[in-house]
Amino acid sequence: MRRVPLAHRNLLAEPRRLLAGVVGIGLALMLIGLLGGLWEGIKAQSARYVNATGAALWVLPPGTRTLFAEGTELPTSTLRTVRATPGVDWAAPTWGLFAILNLHDVRAAVVLVGSTPGQPGGAWALARGRAPAADDEVAIDRVLAAKHGLGLGDRLAVADRSYRVVGITRHAGFMTGYVFATHQAVERLLGAPGKTNAILVGTGQPAAVRARLAAQGLTVLDTPEVRRTVIQLNTKVFASPLRLMVAIAFVAGVLIVALTVYAQVAERRREYGIVKAVGASSRRLAALALAQTLVLAALGLVGGGLLLAVGRALLGWARPQFEVVITPGLLVQSVGAALVMALLASIVPARRLAHLDPATAYRGT
C-alpha cells in the first residue's frame, strides 16, 4: 500500500473541508508568526536608541541601572573626568526624559532627548531635514510626525516652550515617540543648567576603561547591560499576554488539524476498513493519519506565510508604531510549530484507525 498518495486522495475528496482546514491552520500559524514578529519588533525598537549611539560604555547617576530614570542627574563637569581617563576615545552628554505633549488636543507620550550638536546621542537616520543645531529646534520621529500631521517648519510645544521641527527621523521608538533637541535646550526646559543624566563613552577597551572609571567612583554600565535593561523594562508588561495568545493560537491549530483529519477518517471508515482487511497493519494506518496531518500542516504553513505577509503589511499601514520583525529563528519556530501541530493532531485519528474493525468494510456506510 502506498500511503502518501492515499493520504492525498482522501484529503482532496472534500475540497471545501480541506480549504477550511488550511485557512484555519494558516490563520493560527499567521497569528503565531505575527505575535512572534511583534515581540522581536518590541525588542528591536526598545534597543534602537542604545544601538544608534555607538557608545561602548554609559556613565549614569549613582544607583541608576537604566536610561533616563526620573529625578536622576550628573554634573556635566563629570565629562572632564571621563574624557581625561586613559583609553577613552570620546565622551558625550545626553539627557532624556519622558514627557506628555498636547498635540491638537491629543496627548502623546514621547521621550525627549537632548544632545550636543555634532556629537553622538542625538537624532540619527534622518529621513528628511537635519538634526537640531539651535536651542529652539527639534527633530521628531516619522510616526509622531505622520500621526499628528507635523512637518518640517511646524512648531512643537513642549511645556511652556515652542520649538521648530527641522528634521524627521526614519525610525521610531516603541509606544512612545522621539523628540530630539539640543542638550542646552533640555537643561533650560528643566531649569537644570550644568546637569545631564547620562554620559556616552566611546572606547576600544571597554573592560579596562570601565574599571578605571569605576575606580573614580562613577557608575558605569556597558552597552549590552543597558540594552538588556531597556528591553526588560519595555517587554515585561507584554511578555505574559503574548505568550498566552501564542499558546491559544497553537492549541487552535492543533484542534483544527485534528478535527479536519478525524472527520475525514470518520466519513471514510469503510474505505479504511477495506485497506485494513487486505492486510494493512495498525502501524501503517497510523502512519496514514500522520501523513494526512503533515500534508495539511504543510499546506497551512504555506497559507500562514502568505497571511503573515498580508497581516504584517496591514499592521504597518494601520499602526506604524508597531514593527513586525521576521527573523530566521522565527521562521524556524513556525516550521517547528506546524510539525508539532501535525504530530499532536495525528494522535486521535491514528488511534481511531488503529482500533478500526476490518469488518467495517462489509457493513456499508
PLM features per residue range, with description:
Residues 273-316, 333-337, 341:
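Transmembrane alpha-helical interface segments in multi-pass membrane proteins
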Residues 327-365:
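C-terminal membrane-exit region of the final transmembrane helix in multipass inner-membrane proteins
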Residues 11, 265, 274-283, 356, ...:
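Short helix-to-coil transition segments within interhelical loops
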Residues 1-30, 43, 48, 360:
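N-terminal Sec/SRP start-transfer signal
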Residues 212-255, 263-269, 274-275, 283, ...:
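Peri-transmembrane interface segments
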Residues 85, 157-164, 168-243, 248-249:
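Mechanotransmission and gating elements of multispan inner-membrane complexes involved in transport
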Residues 94-97, 103-116, 125-185, 192-194:
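Hydrophobic secondary-structure segments that place a key small or acidic residue at a functional site
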Residues 26, 30-109, 208-213:
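Hydrophobic, regular-secondary-structure patches
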